[in-house]
Amino acid sequence: MTKFDIETAIRSGDYEGVQQHFRGHINEEFTNDGLNLLELLFCYSGNESSRLRIAQLLIDEGITINHLTRGKSSALHFLLGSAKANWTADPEYLLSGVKLLIQAGADVNLRDVHGGTPLSYAIAML
């Protein structure tokens, strides 16, 4: 397994690929911004139901739910912020993702380097 394999599977929302290539390095960081697997997962769209399954797998494996990137963004920031910036997101997918992250302990009050909270990104999507 290479770091590229798991990163590619995460980016494409490939649940089976994640299962195949995941080797227990749950809090490994990717990209120059220091994204963990959960943050990387929510930077991309497509395969939404698979993405939610991957998120649950990562949570079950013990990923740090409130990990912050170098820009102080969390997975919840990425789920809501990327949806506005990069694609037209399905509201049901976003709601399911938000519920999943909050139930896993995501802090809704974390502020990124711009002072934004996940809620401020959610409001901006409307």
What is each of the regions a protein language model found here?
Residues 53, 57, 75-78:
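Generic beta-strand or strand-like secondary-structure segments
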Residues 25-27, 44, 91:
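Short secondary-structure capping/turn segments at boundaries of alpha-helices and beta-strands
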Residues 2-6, 29-44, 68-85, 111-126:
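Ankyrin-repeat boundary/"N-cap" motif
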Residues 19-27, 54-64, 96-107:
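Ankyrin repeat domain, specifically the short helix-to-loop turn at the C-terminus of the second helix
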Residues 47-53, 86-100:
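Surface-exposed loop/turn motifs in large extracellular/passenger domains
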